[in-house]
Amino acid sequence: MQDMKVNTASFMQLYAWYSWPNVILCFFGGFLIDRVFGVRLGTIIFGLFVFIGQIIVAVGAFTDAYWLMELGRFVFGIGGESLAVAQNTYAVNWFKGKELNLVFGLQLSMARLGSTVNMNVMGILYNKVAQTYGSGHSCLGISLMIASVTCLFSLACALILGFLDKRAEKILHKEQGKTGEVVRLTDVKDFPASLWMVFMVCVGYYVAVFPFIGLGKVFFEEKFGFSAPSAGAVNSIVYVISAPASPVLGFMVDRVGKNILWVLVAVLATLGAHVMLAFTFWNPWIPMSLMGVAYSLLACALWPMVSFIVPEHQLGTAYGFMQSIQNLGLAVIAIAAGSILDSSGYLFLELFFCICLCFALIATVLLYLIDLIRDGGLNLSSRERDKKRELDAAEARRAELRRRESQRDLTRLGPRSAFALRNRYLCRLGAQLPAHYSLQLSSLACRSLLK
């Protein structure tokens, strides 16, 4: 902010510009991969968007053009979320069953590891560059340009992965992976109230975590007197903890069940962490560590609930809408958080985050009540959920059997061909027909002769 001479509200616009394109693109990322580009080309294209966006941000900083940095973040956002969809498509195509749970956990862990490295290394890199070129926007631009090497590495991985996937397709005779997501905006009107509560929990929770981490480093420097490296370390502890904790907590939630209960625990824990940061001078490692565990727990418990609520053919729309609302909330709250910090300070900003978490808490309680009234099964134990799934599957098989029997009955009553009608007419007149014409017609013929 000092190098570019902008206030906090303008700085938070960089976060908002990443989220704005994803309010729309979350719906169409899967469609573009399935129908337009394919997973291999789509991964490369979206990786290229990320790389180009980072280059534009670096050039904007180097030339002291803040509007160019905002444009770069917009381009970066176009590729970022859709690249995650492509990554998930590869995972689903190559791993099945229990392997897939581990793969998704490792994906989240690697993402959080990257965030941790960014928070702790970029400050050191900036200081090293400043020793040679001096501080200022030029130093910032050079640092960001060096950081773009990681985006170039990501693009190289996309190219290598595309080559390996193409080779495997020829050897194993596999089809190119698809997301399986069919986005129909008309499905939104059929979403039950419980799903809307999940959306509200998602928005209320994440807007109190990501914008806070974006502003947290300066908060720890000003309130607790931390040095820049120490402030960066405590600010990144949320991601440090979530990297190893996500697979472990995901396994626990999968084994225990009770998803709503875990979501409630996560929201309350995060609310407690923000209250401690706002009203006490306790060591911030304590509330930030608590927030890290709660953040991982909520992700493991909240997102799978969507698949328990809506049928499989609506999952693409549901997850797309959930991500869209999340990005809309992050874009709006990021701007609001910057304005509150500039005008009122960190205490009121923390109170604002507490209000957002209270909103998520109310939505969680309403979700529990709705699920309890409608017997939705979101808070069942793992064993109860498996039993319910077996009963639902058996009922579905019986319904399918009844449907097929009804269809066969309708087929018998359906209109016949001209040849069949002619034979039926002849049978009514008593004419003898060859037996191989139709057993039913032969019986009619015989019955007519007995009259």
Where would I find each of the regions flagged by the language model?
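Helix-to-loop junctions at the C-terminal end of transmembrane segments
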Residues: 24-38, 245-258, 341-342
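Glycine-rich segments within core transmembrane alpha-helices of 12-TM secondary carriers
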Residues: 101-127, 325-333
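Symmetry-related core transmembrane helices of the 12-TM Major Facilitator Superfamily/SLC fold
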Residues: 141-160, 350-367
